């Protein structure tokens, strides 16, 4: 939602929680193909003047995206092409350390895709043939809750799913 002050109210798709995203950099992807940056912050973000700063529950109702643009009204934000329904994505902060350790937000889905692509690369590099037609099927539907079975090719009788496992 584009708020009267030009900032954005967001709602989550999936498991991201506002308290995990506070002060994180975001990108706003418009339907017109433009990308803008901003930061998710508490609506009254100044610890110096907000006496309830530490007590305020962080939810998507108490936080907002402050755009890295000179906008102070809904009209100015909309003039950039930003509208309700555009996608706001958190910076995953992906890093590969000197020792090869990979750290990132949202790594579960990336790792699952990496496993499938690694398997496909192994088959190609080793010139291996599987005994039946095999598809690597990747969906992006997990976060919206309706699964990916609708795009599985006809005739598929077996499936192996690779996903993260909460412990």
Identify the residue ranges that each predicted region occupies.
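N-terminal hydrophobic/helix-forming segments and targeting peptides
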Residues: 1-167
């Amino acid at each position: 939602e584009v708020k009267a002050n030009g900032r954005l109210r967001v709602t989550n798709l999936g498991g991201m929680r506002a308290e995990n995203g506070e002060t994180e950099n975001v990108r706003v992807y418009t339907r017109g193909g433009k990308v803008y940056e901003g930061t998710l912050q508490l609506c009254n973000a100044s610890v110096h003047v907000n006496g309830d700063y530490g007590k305020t529950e962080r939810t998507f109702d108490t936080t907002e995206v402050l755009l890295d643009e000179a906008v102070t009204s809904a009209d100015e934000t909309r003039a950039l092409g930003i509208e309700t329904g555009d996608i706001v994505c958190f910076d995953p902060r992906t890093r590969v350390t000197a020792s090869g350790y990979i750290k990132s937000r949202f790594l579960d889905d990336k790792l699952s895709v990496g496993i499938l692509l690694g398997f496909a690369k192994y088959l190609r590099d080793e010139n291996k043939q599987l005994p039946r037609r095999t598809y690597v099927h990747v969906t992006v539907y997990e976060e919206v809750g309706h699964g990916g079975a609708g795009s599985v090719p006809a005739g598929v009788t077996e499936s192996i799913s690779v996903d993260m496992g909460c412990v």
